[in-house]
From Swiss-Prot:
Its main location: cytoplasm. This is Peptide chain release factor 1. SUPFAM superfamilies: Release factor. It is found in: Cytoplasm. Keywords: Cytoplasm, Methylation, Protein biosynthesis. Residues 281-291 have a biased composition (Basic and acidic residues). Peptide chain release factor 1 directs the termination of translation in response to the peptide chain termination codons UAG and UAA. GO terms for cellular component: cytoplasm. The modification N5-methylglutamine is found at Q231. It comes from Campylobacter jejuni subsp. doylei (strain ATCC BAA-1458 / RM4099 / 269.97).
């Protein structure tokens, strides 16, 4: 029975309340921070549990009043409302009981690269960057460009952005993979539709303590920053290239105003890539049955098609098709795709957990 599964959460929450009011904990900042975080994480399930248990009590109380000559009719109406509320609360609680993705609340690095399609792919990277910027603004996230390489006719060959905001990873993690675009290039005189592709990688920003890097494993090169077309934009060696020798991962950063700033940003991206590599290795070891059917987030997995002539956007992971591509791109309305993906992921997880 669901109610019996919830009792440990209530007991632990009360225990935390007691601990956090004790003088021993109040004098230990580290311990207090850890316990406060646990309490905050438990609060949603505890509040929903209390609402659910109160609903169960109210159902029993109203059942007992059904034969009452004065209150029976009122109890019948109230019982109908409560019986409709009960399964909704149960579903909400089951979702809260699902194992949490530890990365969900993190900031993210969003890395977008032009793939097949040459200039057209670079232009679409630029369009997607603008759309993601509007999405970030809609959700109250802050977005900053970490590094970029412009395309020869506009857009970007590649770009890395840092998206800051609570829950950024929980939503944008669904963007990882290959995005295919079909549209008529401006240079196409006969109106033929061209197909190009770009890749998106979503990497959680990680703390220094989570990823330890041996300085001896790094090769750091400094060089002149270059602007569009290779033009030198300053007279100091401020651009930084860091190579992680064991993995061969290379990160270049030249967008900052100083060598120190560029090195700092490059190290953050390197740590995110190493963390992503570790996570992918961990996921690969899990059984296929436990992998979410929403997709792995692997940048080689084709997840979505943007068809401009048809004003169509299709997400292949859940067979979702919407004919409002223009509005989604113009206003950054990616939640119209992300919300169904989250719902699908939760349904799969509930099935796996037998909840």
């Amino acid at each position: 029975m669901l109610a019996s599964k919830l009792d440990p959460f209530l007991k632990r929450f009360e225990e935390l309340n007691s601990l956090l009011s004790s003088s021993d904990i109040l004098n230990d900042i580290s311990k207090m921070t850890t316990l406060s975080k646990e309490q905050k994480n438990l609060e949603p399930i505890v509040l929903k549990t209390k609402e659910y248990l109160k609903t169960l009590d109210n159902i029993e109380e109203n059942k007992a009043l059904l034969n009452d000559p004065e209150l029976g009719e009122l109890a019948k109406e109230e019982l109908k409302t409560l019986e409709e509320l009960k399964p909704k609360l149960e579903e909400e609680i089951k979702i809260l009981l699902l194992p949490k993705d530890l990365n969900d609340e993190r900031n993210i690095f969003l890395e977008i690269r032009a793939g097949t399609g040459g200039d057209e792919a670079s232009l679409f990277v630029g369009d997607l960057v603008k759309a993601y910027a509007r999405y970030a603004e809609n959700r109250g996230y802050k977005l900053e460009i970490v590094s970029s390489s412009e395309g020869s006719v506009g857009g970007f060959k590649e770009i890395i952005m840092l998206v800051k905001g609570t829950g950024a990873y929980s939503r944008l993690k669904y963007e990882g993979g290959t995005h295919r675009v079909q549209r008529v290039p401006q240079t196409e005189s006969q109106g033929r539709v061209h197909t190009s592709a770009i890749t998106v990688a979503v990497m959680p920003e990680v703390d220094d303590i989570e990823i330890e890097i041996n300085p001896n494993d790094l090769k750091v090169d400094v060089m002149r920053s270059s602007g569009h077309g290779g033009q030198s934009v300053n007279t100091t060696d401020s651009a930084v290239r860091i190579t992680h020798i064991p993995t061969g991962i290379v990160v270049v950063n030249q967008d900052g105003k100083s060598q120190h700033k560029n090195k700092e940003s490059a190290m953050k991206v390197l740590k995110a890539r190493l963390y992503e590599m570790q996570e992918n290795e961990r996921l690969a070891k899990e059984s296929e049955a436990r992998k979410s059917q929403v997709g792995s987030g692997d940048r080689s997995e084709r997840i979505r098609t943007y068809n401009f002539p048809q004003n169509r956007i299709s997400d292949h992971r859940i067979n979702l098709t919407l004919y409002r591509l223009d509005a989604i791109m113009q206003d950054g309305l990616f939640d119209e795709i992300i919300e169904p993906l989250i719902t699908h992921h939760q349904a799969q997880a509930l099935q796996e957990q037998n909840l």
